[in-house]
Amino acid sequence: KFEPTRPMQGIGAHMIGIVTAQELRENLGDVFVSGRTCTEWIDFSISAIERLFLKPELEALLEVVGPNGELIDHHDGRTLNPGHAIECAWFIMHEGVRRKDSRLVSLGLTILDWMWERGWDEE
């Protein structure tokens, strides 16, 4: 849902979508939920994260973006949450290991490396 004042979307629904679908698939099989299999929901969410929230030019996974993945010039749009991003990276890596998909593992590792660096306090 977007509000007309400051249209934006958060990464949370996609990352929770991944882990929820992983758990459903693990316990119930690759069942259909709202017209998609669990694996299709995982693919949908990983694709959205990669397309909208991953910003290689910033070496960051953003918490909030505009409706089409654009940067938001407001404090909401500049929020980084390394812990959240690292959790997201774990879900993507877990899926990559399950599928033996080195591209997904690499994507997760890239997110982990970028956000670990951003979140680490040298002091």
Residue ranges: model-predicted function:
Residues 1-123:
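Glycan-recognition and catalytic cores of secretory/periplasmic carbohydrate-active enzymes
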